[in-house]
Each structure stands twice: as C-alpha cells, then as structure tokens.
C-alpha cells in the first residue's frame, strides 16, 4: 500500500477511535512503530470496539464514545466471549466457507489489545503520574501458539528457498527468459520496470533485508562502492547492512535508468520508484510482493519477499556456519531466531550424503 493511501486509511480509522486510543497512537509514533503496524492495530481495535457495542458490553452509540471504564472493568469472561466470537464469525471477502478466523489472526488481535492495555495500565501517566487504571485483563488471557518443531518448519520452508545455484538462476530467468512468454502489451510493461524489478530481487537475495526496510530505502542510503545500505530496523534502530557483490550490477543498472525512466527529481528521495502519469512515487510493499510472486511462480514456486530473506540467511549460514554472523546480517539481537537455518542446512547436507 502506498504511504499516502496508508496514511489516509489511518486517518479514517482515527476518526472512529476513543480519545485514549488516539493517545496510544501518538505515543507509539515516538517508539517508533511503523505506520503499517499501527494501521493493523487500529483495524483490530475497530473490530474489538464494534463487538463491545454489538454484544451489549458497552451501551455507547459509537466507537468513539466507549469510555475508558469499559476496558478497565472488562472481565476475563467478556474477553473469552470475544475470542469465541472470532472463532465462530463468518469470514468476509473470501471464497472460503469455513467459520471463524485462523489462530494466527486471533493471536494478532490479542497482541494488539495487549499492547493497548499495557499502555493504559503501565506506560501512560495521568496528572498524578499514575496510569489510567491498573487492572490488565489481557494478562489473564492465554494465547494458543501454533505448535511446530524447528525441523518441521525447516522442511516446510526449504521447498520455497532458492538455494545454491538457484539464486543466480532466478535472477537470470527474470533477466533473460521471462519476457519470451509475454504478450506485446505485457512485454512493454515488463521492459519498463525490468531493471528496477531485478534490482529489488537482487537486493533482497543479497542482503536479507525485510520488505519494509527495502521499501523505506532512500537513494542516499545506498553505497555501491562499499556495497552497504543503511536501513531502519524494527524498533527504529538504524543499521548498516552488507550486500553481497552479485547484486551490484543489478543495482547499478537500475540507478542508471532511475532518474529518466521514473521522472525522478532531486526531491524524490525513495530508492525504488514507480511512476504513474508522469508522477514518481515510492514503490509500496504490496507492489513488491506481487512482483516477487509473479516472477517466482513462473520460475519455480510462488514465494514472498520474506522467503528471499530466508534464502539469504540459509546460504550465509551454509557458507559460514556462524549463527552470530547470520543474526547480525538479519538485524536480530539473538541467535535463537537463526536456529531454523541450521536445520535447513543440515537437511541439505543429509540429502547430499544420501546421493553418495
């Protein structure tokens, strides 16, 4: 979603919210939470507040009128009723006829509510320097996490990684073969964005940055002489990220055509641009996701930008056998997250031995 559209949707949701949610939103901007995260949280709050009114827990006529006391006195039984509602509600905007949302969605909803309750009961200060209230019902609500061993997760992910020679084969496929299957109209669009698309894919495969980090990259953040990019990690931490050398020609080719092809001016700071009717804009996450899905599905299997991040991490661990190095490359504070890649690499080694 384009940043401008995202901010518009956030403003629409803010108009519906009670004053204490608006305070929460303003507070989290200073952390900073990303606008994408805050947008998703606001959507969860809207769903929760709508349920409070529809279920009769609150007598308010509109969401903005739900008093703080409703949240303060909400019982564990009330919250469990809300969770049950999520499990049983009919899914909207989908061909899937099953009832209820997934456990992952429920966990995301509860995470958003936990963040709001923590703010109201611990972080905010009233005129006396105290939080608005102390009772946090979310601490009494347990979440059910998806049970899956690292080995099982590694097996599921492994099939969606472009390991070994497949990393360069994927880039070469997009560069040299993909266009032969296209109609004249599709070919024109492909050729306009070919250098940019290749640069994005190469950067993701060569650095392992998150999609949001690639989207928010500015021209000034890219140093091709040192093959380093400056990114803002989760939690607002700034980081310098090394980029593998194989991405350099793709990035150089894109920079060569960026200004002329996308009508970029000095005021257009974004590194990856799209252009519509002569107006350049920062390329949004949704467009990159669709682009990666399109090329990868035609090459081998449909994947997400996050799978390209997993690809880099797995290849780096395979080459170095260092979880510390991989965690630093990915911007993780702990090596625990990188345990997954040891399982993937070990499976690859076992497969190689079986062929001897």
Swiss-Prot record:
Compartments, record wording: Cytoplasm
Repressor listed as a keyword: no
Active site per database record: 210, 234, 306, 309, 332, 341
Regulation: FtsK is required for recombination.
Domain Core-binding (CB): from-to ranges: 16-121
Keywords annotated in UniProt: Cell cycle, Cell division, Chromosome partition, Cytoplasm, DNA integration, DNA recombination, DNA-binding
GO BP: cell division; chromosome segregation; DNA recombination
Any one Gene Ontology cellular component term annotated for this protein: cytoplasm
Statement: the UniProt record of this protein carries the keyword Iron-sulfur: no
Family annotation (Pfam families): Phage_int_SAM_1, Phage_integrase
MF terms (GO), sorted A to Z: DNA binding; tyrosine-based site-specific recombinase activity
Matches recorded under InterPro entries: CB, DNA_brk_join_enz, Integrase-like_cat_sf, Integrase_catalytic, Integrase_recombinase_N, Integrase_SAM-like_N, Recomb_XerS, Tyrosine_recombinase_XerCD
Domain Tyr recombinase residue range list: 169-354
Family the UniProt entry places it in: Belongs to the 'phage' integrase family. XerS subfamily.
Function field: Site-specific tyrosine recombinase, which acts by catalyzing the cutting and rejoining of the recombining DNA molecules. Essential to convert dimers of the bacterial chromosome into monomers to permit their segregation at cell division.
This protein's name: Tyrosine recombinase XerS
Species, as recorded: Streptococcus mutans serotype c (strain ATCC 700610 / UA159)
Species lineage: Bacteria, Bacillati, Bacillota, Bacilli, Lactobacillales
């Amino acid at each position: 979603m384009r940043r401008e559209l995202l901010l518009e949707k956030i403003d629409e949701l803010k108009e519906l919210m009670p004053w204490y949610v608006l305070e929460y939103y303003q507070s989290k901007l200073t952390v900073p939470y990303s606008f994408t995260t805050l947008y998703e949280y606001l959507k969860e709050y809207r769903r929760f507040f709508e349920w409070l009114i529809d279920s009769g827990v609150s007598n308010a006529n509109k969401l903005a009128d739900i008093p703080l006391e409703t949240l303060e006195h909400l019982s564990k039984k009330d919250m469990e009723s809300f969770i049950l509602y999520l499990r049983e509600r009919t899914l909207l905007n989908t061909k899937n006829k099953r009832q209820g949302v997934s456990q992952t969605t429920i966990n995301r909803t509860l995470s958003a509510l936990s963040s709001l309750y923590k703010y109201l009961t611990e972080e905010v200060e009233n005129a006396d320097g105290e939080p608005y209230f102390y009772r946090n019902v979310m601490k009494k609500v347990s979440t059910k996490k998806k049970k899956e061993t690292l080995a099982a997760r590694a097996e599921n992910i492994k099939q969606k990684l472009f390991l070994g020679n497949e990393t360069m084969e994927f880039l070469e496929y997009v560069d040299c073969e993909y266009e032969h299957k296209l109609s004249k109209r599709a070919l024109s669009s492909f050729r306009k964005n070919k250098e940019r698309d290749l640069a994005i894919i190469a950067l993701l495969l060569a650095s392992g940055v998150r999609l949001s980090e690639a989207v928010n990259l500015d021209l000034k953040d890219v140093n091709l002489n040192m093959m380093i990019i400056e990114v803002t990690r989760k939690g607002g931490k700034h980081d310098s990220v090394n980029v593998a050398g194989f991405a350099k020609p793709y990035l150089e080719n894109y920079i060569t055509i960026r200004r002329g092809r996308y009508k970029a001016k000095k005021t257009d700071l974004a590194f990856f641009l799209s252009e519509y009717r002569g107006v350049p804009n920062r390329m949004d996450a949704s467009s990159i996701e669709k682009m990666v899905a399109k090329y990868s599905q035609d090459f081998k299997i449909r994947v997400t930008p996050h799978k390209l991040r997993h690809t880099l991490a797995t290849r780096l661990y395979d080459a170095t056998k260092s979880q510390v190095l991989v965690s630093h490359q990915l911007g993780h504070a702990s090596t625990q997250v990188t345990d997954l890649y040891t399982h993937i690499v070990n499976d690859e080694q076992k497969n190689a031995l079986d062929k001897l």
